[in-house]
Amino acid sequence: MKISEIAKFLGIEYYGDDIEITALNSLNNASFSELSYCDGEKNSKKIASSGAGAILISKEFENLVSKDCVKLVVDNPHLSFALLSKLFAKPLISSEKKQSNIAKSAKIMPNVYIGENVQIADHVVIMAGAYIGDNVSIGEYTIIHPNAVIYNDTKIGKKCHLLANCVIGSDGFGYAHTKNGEHYKIYHNGNVILEDFVEVGACTTIDRAVFESTIIKQGTKIDNLVQVGHNCEIGENCLIVAQSGISGSSILGKNVTMGGQSATSGHLEIGDFATIAARGGVTKNLEGARVYGGFPIMLQKDWLKFQAKIITAFRDKHE
């Protein structure tokens, strides 16, 4: 799509070079044929090093855009990006017919849907009612249980277990908002990558990335009823217990343990070998090799002392 067409769609004037834009991407990873956006002071620091061919930008930060990059000045870059994301969204059902490659040793049970250009390796088992979208690849000895949904472009390693009714690769919870309180969907063009030996519990959901990939690294085990948001990166050999919620763009190091009903607020990092006790609410970056608990999050030993003081104070008041 030409820059002039994008400008017309957004209702803004543009008189510069009419370059071709092929996709949307983040400031960090965009190439010259891709468009990105900057929605605030925090991200404005990334503009100088961005390789994007065009950037949606507010008037406040337009002077930060280099002469080699097209700047499209809009009132709300995030909203404009959301509107454009629909134009660049990949189709849910491909019109392009590409034969899938299914190993002879794979076992596919009845009522399984397999899309276009799917790669299924040796000794894979896919149980009844599963949905496998276009361009999915599944490594050897992986088992996909009944009614699991694997959306387009998902990459699954070897010897993974995906239990019943899990959903891998659906759109994340991303919206831009108008001044009147209307919400516009951000279409997600990334994917999900599950590395080798990953287990995903029943009714767990892992959202695809807006750009690039949501990644679950080798050996991680995820319990039932867990939500992993878009663009998360879960390190090697993590344990995530039932009903936990990992908000978008959270990064967990290796061997992190998330106790039952624990959660992160998103856009933060948890260090290697950290443990979050049940119902812990993580709202900031955490160092590794420590045990945390409570809300707001603190060292678990401090949280227990705090709880003991509350109980003592309450008891003394009523004696």
From Swiss-Prot:
Pfam family membership, one: LpxD
GO molecular function: N-acyltransferase activity
Superkingdom field: Bacteria
GO CC, one annotated term: membrane
Pathway: Bacterial outer membrane biogenesis; LPS lipid A biosynthesis
Gene3D superfamilies listed in its UniProt record: Hexapeptide repeat proteins (2.160.10.10), MurE/MurF, N-terminal domain (3.40.1390.10)
EC number: 2.3.1.191
Active site: 230 (proton acceptor)
Catalytic activity: a UDP-3-O-[(3R)-3-hydroxyacyl]-alpha-D-glucosamine + a (3R)-hydroxyacyl-[ACP] = a UDP-2-N,3-O-bis[(3R)-3-hydroxyacyl]-alpha-D-glucosamine + holo-[ACP] + H(+)
Single Gene Ontology BP annotation: lipid A biosynthetic process
Record keywords, A-Z: Acyltransferase, Lipid A biosynthesis, Lipid biosynthesis, Lipid metabolism, Repeat, Transferase
NCBIfam families in alphabetical order: lipid_A_lpxD, PRK00892.1
The protein's assembly and partners: Homotrimer.
Protein function: Catalyzes the N-acylation of UDP-3-O-acylglucosamine using 3-hydroxyacyl-ACP as the acyl donor. Is involved in the biosynthesis of lipid A, a phosphorylated glycolipid that anchors the lipopolysaccharide to the outer membrane of the cell.
Family the entry assigns: Belongs to the transferase hexapeptide repeat family. LpxD subfamily.
Record-given protein name: UDP-3-O-acylglucosamine N-acyltransferase
Gene source species: Campylobacter lari (strain RM2100 / D67 / ATCC BAA-1060)
